[in-house]
Each structure stands twice: as structure tokens, then as C-alpha cells.
Regions:
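Donor nucleotide-sugar binding/catalytic pocket of nucleotide-sugar-dependent glycosyltransferases
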Residues: 138-181
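Glycosyltransferase donor-sugar binding loop
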Residues: 36-39, 200, 227-240, 259
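Acidic donor-binding loop of glycosyltransferase active sites
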Residues: 268-286, 297
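Conserved acidic donor-binding segment of nucleotide-sugar-dependent glycosyltransferases
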Residues: 313-314, 318-325, 332-339
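Nucleotide-activated donor-binding/catalytic signature segment of Leloir-type glycosyltransferases, i.e.
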Residues: 241-264
Length: 371
């Protein structure tokens, strides 16, 4: 299997670690190949590794892939070939990896190749992305997509793809301490009776934070008291959000925690919150939803991409119009005024099997064995 793993940052590194563990628990022998060099600083200026966290159980990965060195790709392909694999699994999420992955796959063209598609196309599109994606995914035989939208995108570049659509599994591994809401709020110095919303993860333009801040303004105008925590690394200048908070006069309602959150600190933010909000403008699927479900936290998402596939409106959370501060504000008020928490949590518990890693692995292996 090829993909990022700990100590690389981000949800896909967590995902690769957990998929490896699930495949091994299913009785498969798995060798992980990951990056010794992932992105140049020109593309990713901040530190790419999180050395503070302990990871989630895979400590035998081979850090051998240099994404910009063609001679390295030949060497890596030879190393994989010597293992005589029955199946090669690659994590796919961005065309930056196209030259590297295409070359390795072409050198291993006689092997069975499966791509796990986190996004068939990148969130932030650019002129050559479709060509690079078609070029690389054309090397694959099998595909896992995690939303119906991504399946449609896949078929637009690979008409004969053998694929399955199965949802992103739940991230339950952050619940290390079983931290109570009371303890989490004590650590974060949040009043125990405060209403608390959470926006978590890398802050990007497509994630729609500006509409959530506008919703906070509407709630203030309606004298509905609630506190929003924005926790994560800003991939762009945060000043526009700071200015928006200032203009809306909601500084007393918004707490910003800037920076990448180490794995060991994720728990307290989710444990302290009532509702996790993802006001995205575009999406295929989201690991943040599955972190929230791992903590049995309801979510508020927008009706974009694959988010409605995993959130059942009125049962495990809310699905609202994108780019609409009004519908976000209305859903937040409904959650608290009508005390939806208990009913939503009960439904989240019932859907655990649907989002389990075992279900994911069973779906993947059934596809490969049937073909």
C-alpha cells in the first residue's frame, strides 16, 4: 500500500494507518510504502510532519518514496515487485502525485492496482488537473470512492472502472481518554452550561467559514447565545476572517485556536462541543464528519458533494443549503431549542456498522475477489 502515514500531518495519513491496521486484522499481509519527501516547500510552506503525536499503530512503513525523483520511482517499483504483491493499493487525492504514481504503476502494470479515491479531482481546481488525473487513474483496475459524486467523476475519466462506493469510515481512535464534556470544558475554560459549536481542521476557502461567521452574527442579532470554536491550521491569510469577526462584532462569541492540532489534543475540542459545523462550499467526503461521529457528536453540513450521503438530515445532524448563513443559523437554533442531542446521538450509534473499517475492507476485498 502506498500513501502518507504518521508522522505526516492530515487526515489521509490517519486514514492510511487505520486502513493498514484493518486489512491486517482481516488476515492480510500488508507492506506500507510512504514518502521520504512529499511536498516541496514552494507548495506547502509549513512543517509537513507532526512529531508530537504517537500515531495509530503502524510503525513499520518504508519511508522510501521521493515524489520529485524519477530515478527513485524506478527503485521503488523494483522494491515492490520483489514482494510479489497480490494487490497494490494507492491513496489518491491530488494530481501533484500523478507523475510519481503513474510511473510506479506503469512499471508494475502486470499487477492488480487499486486506487482509494479521497477526491478524484482536487478541491481547488487548476488547468491540467483533469488530464493528470485521467492519466494516472487510467493505470488502475479497481477503485474505491467514498461518495456518489466522486464515482461520477471517476467514470468521467475511467469509463471501464471496476469500483465500489462505500462511505469514509469513522475515526474513533482519537477517543483515547474517554474524556467527558465536563473535563474537556474545564481544560478549555468553557462554562459548563455554554452552548458550544466547533469548526475543526485546515481552514480553506472552500470550507465556507465566512458563512458560519455570518450565521453567528444572525444569532447575536436574535439574542441567541452560543460560542463558536474555530480550531485548525489556516492555509490562507486568516486576517479576512479576523476582519469579518470585527465587522460583525462577534469577537466575544468566537474563539480561534490557530495551528495544527496534535492527535493527542483532538479529543478535548470534540468532547467539549455540542455540534460540529461544516459549512462547506464543495466537498467529496469529509474526515471531520467521521471524527465527530467517532465522538458521537451530531454534525451540521451543507448539501454539497458526498456530505448528504453520510449525514441523515434530522437524524444524525442537519443538511442545509450551501452559502446560506440563514439556514445555518436556523439549524443551530433548532438543535438547542428542541433538545435534539439525545435523539441524534442515538441514531449515530445505530449507524456505527455502516461506517466501520470492517465494512470498508469487506467491500474492497469482495470487489477484488469477484473480478
Amino acid at each position: 500500500m502506498i500513501g502518507p502515514v504518521h508522522p505526516y500531518k492530515g487526515g489521509i495519513a490517519h486514514y492510511t494507518d487505520l486502513l493498514c491496521r484493518a486489512l491486517r486484522e482481516d488476515g492480510n499481509e500488508v507492506q506500507l510504502y510512504t514518502f521520504k519527501f512529499q511536498y516541496p516547500k514552494l507548495l506547502y510552506k509549513k512543517p509537513q510532519k507532526d512529531m508530537k503525536s504517537s500515531g495509530f499503530g503502524t510503525n513499520d512503513a518504508d519511508f522510501c518514496i521521493h515524489t520529485l525523483n524519477p530515478f527513485n520511482w524506478i527503485k521503488v517499483a523494483g522494491r515492490i515487485k520483489k514482494q510479489k504483491p497480490e494487490l497494490i493499493i494507492l491513496q489518491w487525492w491530488h494530481p501533484y502525485f500523478a507523475p510519481c504514481f503513474w510511473s510506479i504503476c506503469k512499471l508494475l502494470r502486470r499487477e492488480k492496482i487499486l486506487f482509494v479515491c479521497h477526491n478524484v479531482f482536487p478541491h481547488e481546481r487548476f488547468p491540467l488537473d483533469r488530464l493528470l488525473t485521467k492519466w494516472t487513474l487510467g493505470c488502475g483496475r479497481y477503485f474505491i470512492t467514498q461518495s456518489k459524486m466522486d464515482a461520477r467523476d471517476l467514470l468521467s475519466v475511467k469509463h471501464d472502472a471496476v469500483y465500489r462506493v462505500t462511505p469514509h469510515p469513522t475515526y474513533g481512535m482519537f477517543c483515547k481518554q474517554g474524556m467527558s464534556m465536563q473535563k474537556a470544558r474545564e481544560q478549555l475554560q468553557i462554562d459548563q452550561v455554554q452552548r458550544v459549536l466547533l469548526f475543526f481542521g485546515f481552514v480553506r476557502k472552500y470550507k465556507g467559514l465566512q458563512y458560519l461567521l455570518e450565521a453567528m452574527k444572525l444569532l447575536k442579532e436574535r439574542d441567541f447565545k452560543v460560542q463558536l470554536w474555530v480550531v485548525g491550521d489556516f492555509g490562507e491569510d486568516k486576517e479576512e476572517y479576523v476582519e469579518q469577526i470585527r465587522a460583525f462584532e462577534i469577537g466575544d462569541q468566537v474563539q480561534m485556536v490557530e495551528g495544527y492540532v496534535p492527535d493527542d489534543e483532538v479529543e478535548k475540542y470534540f468532547a467539549a462541543s455540542d455540534l460540529v459545523v461544516l459549512p462547506y462550499l464543495s466537498a467529496t467526503q469529509s474526515g471531520i464528519v467521521q471524527i465527530a461521529f467517532g465522538f458521537e457528536k451530531p454534525v451540521l453540513v451543507t448539501e454539497v458533494g458526498g456530505l448528504p450521503d453520510v449525514v441523515t438530515n434530522g437524524k444524525t445532524g442537519y443538511v442545509v443549503e450551501p452559502r446560506s448563513a440563514e439556514t445555518i443559523a436556523e439549524a443551530i437554533m433548532d438543535y438547542y431549542i428542541n433538545n435534539r442531542r439525545e435523539a441524534f446521538v442515538s441514531q449515530i450509534e445505530k449507524e456505527k456498522d455502516r461506517f466501520s473499517w470492517k465494512t470498508f475492507v469487506d467491500t474492497m476485498m469482495e470487489m477484488v475477489r469477484r473480478d
